[in-house]
Amino acid sequence: MGGLDGEQKLLIKKLVNFRMKEGKRTRVRAIVYQTFHRPARTERDVIKLMVDAVENIKPICEVAKVGVAGTIYDVPGIVARDRQQTLAIRWILEAAFKRRISYRISLEKCSFAEILDAYQKRGSARRKRENLHGLASTNRSFAHFRWW
């Protein structure tokens, strides 16, 4: 991680932390580096590809459940920058795990394929973002209930 700027280092650190289970950081770090060292089909830097993929998946708005007079409404709201990045990474990893279960291939290949799909604005992580934006636009008439 020598020639990376602060944002890229933070993104890789978040990726490792989200993927880590039972405190096995070195194992997860090796998987992440194998993912990044896979031969890319593009000529771009793989870390830059990951940053752009996360940018394509970041949600702008989300919905929160608010109870008013005994009725629960889905109220749309703006997502903070850190939460945008967190949700994007989480969705990419969830999609990679689902792809791994359905196709029975290595996690490195699944992660790289999902990052490539996110970069090209397709895949299940992008679909999840579009579904969330659709839900927020459907419920935008309840935006006046937002008081947080």
UniProtKB/Swiss-Prot annotation:
One of its GO terms (molecular function) is rRNA binding. GO terms for cellular component: mitochondrial small ribosomal subunit. The keyword Isomerase does not apply. It is found in: Mitochondrion. GO terms for biological process: translation. It comes from the Eukaryota. Its main location: mitochondrion. Keywords: Mitochondrion, Ribonucleoprotein, Ribosomal protein, RNA-binding, rRNA-binding. The keyword rRNA-binding applies. Coiled coil: none annotated. Pfam families: Ribosomal_S7 (PF00177). NCBIfam families: rpsG_bact (TIGR01029). A stretch of 270 kb of the mitochondrial genome is duplicated within the centromere of chromosome 2 resulting in the duplication of the gene. The expression of this duplicated gene (At2g07696) is demonstrated. One of the primary rRNA binding proteins, it binds directly to 18S rRNA where it nucleates assembly of the head domain of the small subunit. Belongs to the universal ribosomal protein uS7 family. Part of the small ribosomal subunit. This is Small ribosomal subunit protein uS7m. It comes from Arabidopsis thaliana (Mouse-ear cress).
